[in-house]
Amino acid sequence: VESTGFDLLVMGRTEGPGCYCHANDLLRGFLEKLAGGYSHVVMDNEAGMEHLSRRTTRDVDVLLMVANATVTAVRSAGRIHEIAQKLKLSPGSSHLILNRLNGPADLPGAGTAFAAELEKLEAAGLSLLGEVPYDEQVVMCGMEAKGVDELPEDAPALRAIAEMMEKLNL
């Protein structure tokens, strides 16, 4: 899909068992060929670690992991960060984004298992970049089959993301 301001390449996946080798080779090839024509390339991968071990993600400047504010989700993000390091993907920086928070009260305070997990991640080089608040407008876009590009500029989720992109100088 080509549009004003961005182009979109979607990689489908087959359902059920089977080898993804050919699909991953195609994806790698497209990315290597097309990436040079863009100032920024954003890869939105399915949750999980498979795309890293399949090495479809190379030459990463910034690795962002989005997780809900639970110990389990944050540990998974930490594991992904660890695998990226073991596979020598060498992202310039790695950051965690907490998603769908209802407010500051959703972030457990010091002394909780969640806070301890965040401290471990920070020590391992995975810093907390920011939080995306729960945003009813995002939910409504999904229910009305609209894209997030149709959100109003003052949508809380968009404002939070814009602040994080500023922190990253993007």
Listing of model-derived features with the role each one plays in the protein:
Residues 22-131, 140:
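Conserved catalytic-core segment of NTP-binding enzymes
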Residues 142-158:
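C-terminal boundary of histidine-terminating zinc-finger modules
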Residues 160-170:
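C-terminal alpha-helix
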Residues 1-32, 143:
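P-loop/Walker-type NTP enzyme "switch/lid" segment
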Residues 17-20, 105-106, 151:
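A generic structural signal for short coil/turn motifs at secondary-structure boundaries
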Residues 13, 49, 146:
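Gly/Ser/Thr-rich helix-start
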Residues 8, 40-42, 147-148:
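Residue-level preference for the first positions of well-ordered beta-strands
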